[in-house]
Amino acid sequence: MTSLQCPPPDRTRRSLSPTGPKFRESCKSCAASKIRCTKEKPQCARCVKRNMVCEYLESKRARRKPGARLKHRESITTNAHHSPTTTTITTSRTTSSSPSASPKTYHPLNYVDILSWTPTPTLPDSATDTQTGLHCNFDDFLAFSHSTSLLGVPEAGELPVHLTTDFRQLEELNRAPEALDEILQCRCSEDGYQLAILSVVILKVLGWYATIIRPLLGVEAHSPGVGEGTTVRTDSLAETQLSSSFYVDSGQQISPKITMGPPLAYGRESEGKTRMAAQLILSQLHRVQRLVNILCHRFKLHSNREQNPAWNSSTASTATEPEGPAYIEHLYPFSSLVFDQIEKDVRGRLRSLSTELLEMLRY
């Protein structure tokens, strides 16, 4: 008995051959006149009646071009063939007792910048704002300190004593008074800790001004070795050592020694550059003087609070000095003697630098 099998039905496959272009339903003349076209082809009745050229334009509808999907697959295939092979890296855990473990290389302490590190807040921004109420924007000052490393150690690991006489350094250094002025306008600068930090920054700025101008006066500076540092003060050009002292991260104090070199030979090419640098620094010292006056005024406010705890800061505040928060008035982080000594050091350093610049420009 023979079994009859029906032939499989013919599955008509859609032709992938590109179809012809589609034309618009209205001719060009009817579309321009905004009249309903009769849509006869090759010529509509209106164009035949008026003896006009009837032209049907190609439709510009956005549609997928025939064969575009096939080309896309071919491009993906070619890119997969030409792509480089990726290597997988497997990491194995090594215990501290394994002898084959490589020793860890720690970052040297000389590369650490104080102001480049900012602590991560543990509380959300809304919680910290409601608790403290202090809103200070230190972004500009931190960016400036990162570029000039005022409170940090240079990347070379050496003390920044001998500097090149580049006026771009002076232009970057002149941004420090602007940043300090913005910080002093904030209420958080009423705190004694902030005042002490700002005083150290001002001393550092004055020290950098001195290290830029003193090599131009024939003064050579070199850093002593470890264990050779001693702290020595200076007040004029005739003295042989710099007053600013530096501290390394190990806790040992190092102060740069200054040895007098030959005097500056006026009349050479370096004379004009030296005098120009001195005039530029001297023109910026009045801004530093203003910052020192604000700091000293706030030192006196803290001294008055220490002597009289019931003293109200609103009675002594001026238009330029913002009134501090009420909960800061009872904070006395330092005694009045410490602030008096800081004031003497800052004013003495500013007076010494101004005297040196005036003596140099006088001749």
Curated annotation (Swiss-Prot):
A GO-annotated cellular component: nucleus
Bias-annotated ranges (Low complexity): 76-102
DNA-binding region: 27-54
Natural source organism: Aspergillus aculeatus (strain ATCC 16872 / CBS 172.66 / WB 5094)
InterPro entries: AflR, Zn2-C6_fun-type_DNA-bd_sf, Zn2Cys6_DnaBD
Disordered: annotated segments: 1-24, 63-104
Keyword Transcription regulation: yes
Protein's recorded name: Transcriptional regulator AacuR
Native organism taxonomy: Eukaryota, Fungi, Dikarya, Ascomycota, Pezizomycotina
